[in-house]
Amino acid sequence: MTMTNAAISAVSEMAIEEIRRKLDDDGYCLVPDALDAKELETVRLALDRILEEDDAAGVALRYGPDGANQRVWAMLNRGEEFVRLATHALGLAIVRSGLGPDIQLSNLSANVTGPGGNREIGRLHTDQGFLPEPWPYQLATNVAFFLDDFTEENGATLVVPGSHRTLTVPDHGLAPSAPMRLTGKAGTMAVWDGRLHHATGLNRTPDQRRRGIFATYIRPFLRTQENWCRSLDRHLLDRHPELSALCGFEEWQTLGGVNGARQSGLNF
């Protein structure tokens, strides 16, 4: 993806090195205006269409109080707009600053919190809790794009600053501080360490949705949450060759060969 003017502006205001320091210290960072107004509106319209389609087809994945919240998985298959988010130049640069040059996209999903909740939706968790503790180093990074303003009232993501340094899931040991909400304007990109304790927040508003697109990236030797080899639309690999490595279709060092041999991509 060509870096947009909005992304270039964001880099000029907060260099990747400064973002990296913020991530190392607090476990999270907010980058305002990562999406410009046109990009934001395009993604919003595409997501709203998908939500309506899933509802009409009876396949909407709803959760939380009264089913007010909705999740959509495998967003790469749902539109070019979401491929562009997964390959967002600034987002990938920040991810690689922590995980190294070779990364995989573990999942890409939409998460919408609906109004009227009366309790927190998500349980505090990390995104590398499937690995033995204590963790030797960071193995995952999350990138979220705010499609609406994320506020104290409408379900902004909860995080525990500094909790990535505990090297354990939230159930093990005492959190270093109380949870806070990642608030920001629509178009903001939030990035957080996969070890950071976080959760979906409670939407206390009577009539507001909180829409976001969430990507998780991992080191290349880990298994992805979404099995792209089974679910990815193969035509996307022709249109977006960069997805081949990002979705685990390429070898990495001695892993992922075919019949013991290395090859570029897979033929279907």
Q: What does each of the following model-derived ranges do?
A:
Residues 81, 94, 143-146, 199:
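Short, hydrophobic/aromatic alpha-helical segments in well-folded domains
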Residues 117-183, 222-232:
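Catalytic core of non-heme Fe(II) oxygenases with the double-stranded beta-helix
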Residues 107-110, 143-145, 213-217:
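A structural signal for short, well-ordered beta-strand segments
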Residues 68, 78, 106, 139-141, ...:
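Residues that flank catalytic or metal-binding motifs in active/ligand-binding sites
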Residues 166-191, 195-197, 201-268:
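Conserved double-stranded beta-helix
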Residues 2-26, 31-131:
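Non-heme Fe(II)-dependent double-stranded beta-helix
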Residues 30-31, 145, 190-192:
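Short hydrophobic-aromatic micro-motifs
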